Amino acid sequence: MQYDGTNYCGWQIQQNAPAIQQTITDKIEIISKFKVNLIGSGRTDSGVHALGQVANFKTENEINIYKFKHSLNAILPNDISILEMEQADELFNARFHARRRCYIYLFSNFKSPFFQRYSYYYHESLDCKLLNKLCLSFLGEKDFTSFTRKNTETENKICNIYEARWKETKGLIIFYIEADRFLHGMVRTIIGTLIKALKENCDEKFIEDIFSAKDREFAGEAVPANGLFLYKVKY
């Protein structure tokens, strides 16, 4: 599925705030007439978008996949779209069976009313070559305590980053990152830290010291949510 996260508090259901998960669940239940537990591959944060989110729900009822998808898209708001639906194995779990999650972050280097909603307008230059060199410090299995919120409920802060790279193309700078899992606010904090290191002419040791500190206050300021997309989930 795809969604524009601008008007939502994120994927996960919360009280007194619109969530992607709740919005889709409500529409499924209208069509199906039964209660469902919609499980997403991951919890995108408030304001974060998705190009390839995956979710599943279980039912004992017979469903015509084509008609169900068409009906669901017809009543979903315009900022949420179901791209594909298929029957999965009974034991499939979109969250726990996901091997890797991939995110992209978009920077625009010129002001455009058409890019503002889905990219971070950043007027200063970004040296992708130097940023890619700094990215090497994030690769592998590490403790990302310094790159997530202090009051997060997640006890295990170990994540394995397989790939992280920057690329410039047609007025946009794209950051791509792939890992087995991500913590709350982790991607945006990593990006903010990389930019901080670039602006202050820091080397890899700067990044290593942040990891060692295991304290969010040592990392850079998180970049805005509007440029971040859940790009793909790999199974």
Cite the ranges covered by each PLM segment.
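Structured-RNA-binding interfaces characteristic of tRNA pseudouridine synthases
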Residues: 1-235
